[in-house]
């Protein structure tokens, strides 16, 4: 007689095994209609699975996160059902849940087009309307293998062959279509309503470029039409802000096939990069960091000593010279230890903070490259702090202040903080890990920040704190980190003399604020939609003449502004002034100074902003006060009418 305990503590006793569907029906018709799965003693199960033991249960609906994932997984199977009806020769591979949706990898002789996606989506909608039950059957490995062998589903057979012989396999049946999965899935297609197929792309079977290329159809699915529409609106907004499109439109950068994953910075894009670098450099100087520069290529022996050769060899670019093998550095830390190792260090010298705008190369798969966001060559705002164990908390605390100051300068207010703790495989004693994790947690708690743990997600050499930005359309970008390292200083022979004249190994803190310049600029392009605040804008001011008579004055004012440190230019083309204003507004130039005969005679400029605000006529000195204030606000600048 199973005793069932509900989330509110209420208990129900049954004389025979009972299912989630039956329990939900007893509680009420509304819950019975909404139930899509159950959680039994912490394990997710289908609504039809009998419960024969005492259990704590939770009934899962589309309002639960688990429920949304179940809906998405069920949609993947429904996609498979529709594909096999429309394209019987297609072979189904895998169809997992991903963030905000699902995908299915499919082998098919023809390339799926957008028209094909529309037809598949229509067939899915037709199947949903049939409100059929999804039937689950648990079978032996042998029966599952025969089922898919009979259906000529070679990819499913490959997966089954890797499952231990004594395991059972769940088959989920959508009418004539059969798929396999751990489950659970929705009990009926009536729970599958809000979805959209998004795109199709190529994907290698099992992610291995030596295997055949499959076609991956992506979809999104939600618990309600309202949630789906909100997500599609967010996707539309993200596409509008795509840094690759804006970068091309504003002539900031480009990539090309001859240098995959490498950025060609154009003058305006490089201007943004230089402003960013100068800002970070000034900030580091004020926080007692010493800037260094280390080599791009280093003999493989150093990477073997540091441990990178064993773990990252496949991701490293290498070259040879005079029978020696070199790696183009994928990270800066081993080289920073070489700088620390030059000369004897005392405990009185610590902490030592070494910073570098280090150019790194990593051999990312070509299919993963994405504009500025995922590249093969990138520059990190990298630094390493060499300190004692006792100094960890204080150094972390100072770095947290630094991170928040920098992010605030760009206008980011919502910061998500996570602390990654010790993994199963690690170096260092439990005592050192205890101290380090406590030091990081205490540093966060003293600041009274909200944060959460990522258990087991730390590196093998130490725990870390991750700082992620939430942008204006609620996307999360992981940028800053500070990570404790007990291993590498020891491996590479770093040491200092302590107060007892004994040689000791320093702790090394890896830290970055932006992560990489390329990716952070990509984030900024999308955050600002190319409408950079004046301090970052490649061109801060353009002086526009109304007629040829104003050309000389335009050039004079532009040159004067440049001499005073502003990024200024002029437009004296023989075009209508309205056309010129429109063009430069579309180029997102913050301030447009218009000069006609009246302004030239009065010694004034007429000021407009890229946001369409007419600030009226004023003396150049008055305009300088306005732009100086705007620049001083950095990323917190907001366009306002003339005061």
From Swiss-Prot:
Its EC number is 6.1.1.3. Zn(2+) binds at residues 333, 384, 510. The gene is thrS. Residues 1-61 form the TGS domain. It comes from Prochlorococcus marinus (strain SARG / CCMP1375 / SS120). GO terms for cellular component: cytosol. This is Threonine--tRNA ligase. Binds 1 zinc ion per subunit. Homodimer. InterPro entries: aa-tRNA-synt_IIb (IPR002314), aa-tRNA-synth_II (IPR006195), aa-tRNA-synth_II/BPL/LPL (IPR045864), Anticodon-bd (IPR004154), Anticodon-bd_dom_sf (IPR036621), Beta-grasp_dom_sf (IPR012675), TGS (IPR004095), TGS-like (IPR012676). It catalyses: tRNA(Thr) + L-threonine + ATP = L-threonyl-tRNA(Thr) + AMP + diphosphate + H(+). It is found in: Cytoplasm.
């Amino acid at each position: 007689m199973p005793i069932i305990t509900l989330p509110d503590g209420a208990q129900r006793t049954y004389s025979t095994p009972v299912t989630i569907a039956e329990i939900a029906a007893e509680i009420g018709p509304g819950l019975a209609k909404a139930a899509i799965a159950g959680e039994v003693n912490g394990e997710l199960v289908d609504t039809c699975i009998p419960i024969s033991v005492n259990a704590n249960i939770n009934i899962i609906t589309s309002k639960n996160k688990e429920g949304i994932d179940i809906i998405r997984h069920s949609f993947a199977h429904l996609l498979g059902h529709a594909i096999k009806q429309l394209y019987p020769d297609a072979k189904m591979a895998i169809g997992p849940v991903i963030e905000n949706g699902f995908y299915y990898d499919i082998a098919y002789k023809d390339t799926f087009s957008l028209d094909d996606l529309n037809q598949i989506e229509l067939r899915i909608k037709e199947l949903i309307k049939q409100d059929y039950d999804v039937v689950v059957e648990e079978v032996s490995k042998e029966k599952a293998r025969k089922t898919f062998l009979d259906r000529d589903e070679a990819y499913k057979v490959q997966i089954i062959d890797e499952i231990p012989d004594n395991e059972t396999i769940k088959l989920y049946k959508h009418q004539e279509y059969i798929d396999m999965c751990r489950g659970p899935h929705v009990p009926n297609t009536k729970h599958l309503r809000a979805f959209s197929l998004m795109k199709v792309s190529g994907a290698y079977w099992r992610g291995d470029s030596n295997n055949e290329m499959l076609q991956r159809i992506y979809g999104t699915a939600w618990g309600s039409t309202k949630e789906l529409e909100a997500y599609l609106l967010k996707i539309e907004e993200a596409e509008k802000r795509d840094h690759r499109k804006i970068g091309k439109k504003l002539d900031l950068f480009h990539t090309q096939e001859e240098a995959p994953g490498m950025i060609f910075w154009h003058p305006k894009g490089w201007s943004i990069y230089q402003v960013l670098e100068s800002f970070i450099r000034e900030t580091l100087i004020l926080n007692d960091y010493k800037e260094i520069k280390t080599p791009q290529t280093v003999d493989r022996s150093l990477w073997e000593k540091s441990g990178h050769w064993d773990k990252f060899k496949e991701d490293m670019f290498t070259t040879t010279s005079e029978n020696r093998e070199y790696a183009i550095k994928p990270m800066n830390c081993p080289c920073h230890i070489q700088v620390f190792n030059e000369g004897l260090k005392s405990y009185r010298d610590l902490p030592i903070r070494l910073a570098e705008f280090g150019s790194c190369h990593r051999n990312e798969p070509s299919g993963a490259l994405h504009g500025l966001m995922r590249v093969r060559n990138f520059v990190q705002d990298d630094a390493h702090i060499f300190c004692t164990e006792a100094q960890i908390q204080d150094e972390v605390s100072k770095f947290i202040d630094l991170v928040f100051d920098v992010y605030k300068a760009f206008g980011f207010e919502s910061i998500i903080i996570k602390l990654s703790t010790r993994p199963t495989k690690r170096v260092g004693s439990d005592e050192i890990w205890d101290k380090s994790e406590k030091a990081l947690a205490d540093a966060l708690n003293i600041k009274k920040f909200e944060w959460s743990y990522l258990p087991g997600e730390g590196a093998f050499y130490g725990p870390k704190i991750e700082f992620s930005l939430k942008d204006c359309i609620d996307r999360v970008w992981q940028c800053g980190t500070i990570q404790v390292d007990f291993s590498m200083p020891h491996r590479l022979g770093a040491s200092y003399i302590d107060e007892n004249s004994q040689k000791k190994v320093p702790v090394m803190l890896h830290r970055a604020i932006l992560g990489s310049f390329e990716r952070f600029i990509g984030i900024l392009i999308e955050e600002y939609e190319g409408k950079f605040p004046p301090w970052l804008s490649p061109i801060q001011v353009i002086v526009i003449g109304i007629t040829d008579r104003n050309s000389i004055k335009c050039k004079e004012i532009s040159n004067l502004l440049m001499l005073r440190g502003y990024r200024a230019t002029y437009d004296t083309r023989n075009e209508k002034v309205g056309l010129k204003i429109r063009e430069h507004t579309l180029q997102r130039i913050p301030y447009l100074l218009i000069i006609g005969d009246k302004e030239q005679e009065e010694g004034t400029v007429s000021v407009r902003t890229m946001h369409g605000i007419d600030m009226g006529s004023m003396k150049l000195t008055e305009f300088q006060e306005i732009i100086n204030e705007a620049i001083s606000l950095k990323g917190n600048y907001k366009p306002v009418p003339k005061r």
